[in-house]
Each structure stands twice: as structure tokens, then as C-alpha cells.
Amino acid sequence: MTNNIRSLEQTLLENLPWNKARIKFLARFLLALYAVRTVNLASLATVFAGHAKEESNYKRLQRFLRKFELPYVQLAEFVVKLLGVEGPYTLALDRTNWQVGAVDINILLLSIVYRGVGFPVVWLVSPWPGNSSTEERKLLLELFFELFGAHQIACLLGDREFVGQEWFRFLKRHQVKFQMRLKKDTQVRNGRGQLVPAWRLFAHTGLNRCLVLPAARRMWGLELFLSGCYLGNGEYLILVAPEYTPAPHLEYKKRWGIEMLFGALKSRGFNLEDTRLQDPARLDKLLALLALAFTWAFVVGEWQAAVKELKLKKHGYPPKSIFRLGLNILCRLVTNFEYFDVTVWNRVIKLLSCT
């Protein structure tokens, strides 16, 4: 296994200009994470490669998250390089939260959507509950601008939390196209200039039939375009955009990719909520490591799905997601030494090398 770890270290070193000690840690962290499928440090410490005692491994994990100044730009660029997808990108913005004891963990995350899945590129971790602020959202977008440029955004997708005058002005100022969902009772003007709940404009569209209003409406002091459809049971999907779009709901469906990401980071992959970390800075670093681990697993699954035709179940979907397919392969490689396949290992390393 030593030679295999070295090949992983060498590949990481070729893509991340870190010192050797940090690269060695990252390689062992990835292997341990794929083995135990949890971010719980105590569990990771039990399978950390090397001759060190479990207690020493645990302290090493803590020390990395506490002291190492992680170069997030390099990791974000590596994630995008690993995906092999070029911009402009469809982005999905969302928030997830949970509690560690009495402490709130709140993560605002921006992801690139590719093949129906979100891939994390920038995020903010907050120690307080509740919705994100406009300033937090603007900061997140500015981080993306610094990395890739505003021109690399094809469309920004977000749920009902992400609306407001200052926020929309910011997006329009940077010429960012967006599709944001509105609450159905948001007050808008109808054709006669009367203020009515937004859902009334789409009350007669029919079930799951989309209507795009041809003229802009004045909202939050801005000229914005509305579209909507009735979902049944009193629910409406109402979208707001800075310009007329023929089929906005098809674009908005891509927002589901970030929900897929959160599921993979949590219960269907790395069990993020198992962490006992409470400090935002340490959680920030942990998320960066998970971004790389998640993307590598997806790319491995993508390769496997291409060489081995997946049988679809009755509902029309494969039994495993591409991410889970890749995660299972990596898990088997790092845990089942009796059946270790060096050919497969070399292949997954080549995928990580982006060559």
C-alpha cells in the first residue's frame, strides 16, 4: 500500500503546490475518509495510514484543522480542473444548517452544477442560526468573481431565501443572470397596476404548465421578469429574472444539484453532521477537503458509468448515483486489500491527475 500512497501524494503534489508534509496529510485524509465515510475525527484517526498511534493521528487531524492556512483558491481551481468543465457555469446557491450541542452551524454555499450535481467552489460558515444576509451573499459572489470572473456565470439559481432589492441590484450591476424563486404571496402588480399576491398571476396556468409573462414588472425598484406554474396542493413555482427567458423552469430544475451535493456531504456520503467541530474556521477547512474528496469520487463514478453500462430500475434511474458509484470503488480500493486491483488504482490516480 505504501507505493500506492506515494502515487497519490505525487499526483496531489503536481496539482497543489503545498509542502510535502501537507500533501502527505491530505493523501492520508482522503484514504481514511473513503474508508470510514465520516468526518468524525475519532473515526478517521483509527484508519489513518502509517505507524503512528491512534491518539497521535487524532492530534494530527486537530492540528491541521487548527493551524494550517489552507489555500482555498488552489483547491477550488483543482476541483474545477478535475471536473474538466469550462465556463460559463450554472451556479446554485443554498444554505444548510444543523446544531452541534447548543452551537448552530450555518453554511452558505455556492456550487457549480454539472450533470445534475452541485460541486462546491466557495462557501461561508457562520456560528448563528437564520437566513443569510445580503452582505454574506455579496461576499460569496465576490469570492467567485475573484476566482473565475463574473463573466463565467451563465445563470445563478436560488430558492426563496435569496431575494431582495440590494441583492438584485448587486447581481444586475455585475450583469449576473439569475432565476430566483419567489414566495407565492410576494406582492406584485397585475396588468391593471394593482398589487396582488404573485400566485394570482399564474392561478389559471394549469397543473405543471409554465407561463412566462412577456413584460417586465416593477419589483424592489427594478424591472424584473416573472414566470410561474401551479404545482398542485396550493403550491406554485414562481421565478424572477433580470431578463425575459423562454423556458426558465427548465433552467431552475438544475438547482436540485446542490440538494444532491448536501445529501452526499451528509447522510449519503461523508456524514458531515457527525463532526463535533464548532469553530467556523476549522469547519471551513474541513469543507475544502470534502470538496476535493467529493469531486474525485464523482469523477471516478463517471468513468465507471462510462465503461460499465448501468441498469436502470423501474423508475428510470440507476440504483446508485454517479457519486456513490465512485465512492464505493474508492472505498473498496482502500479497505479490501485482498482484492486490491492495481489497474483500477492506477486509473483512479490518472483521473485525479487530470491527464
Question: Model regions: which residues?
Answer:
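Single, function-defining residue in the core of a domain
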Residues: 1-40, 50-52, 74-76, 86-89, ...
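Short, basic interhelical loop/turn and adjoining N-cap
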Residues: 47-60
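Active-site-proximal, Lys/Arg-enriched surface segment
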Residues: 58-116
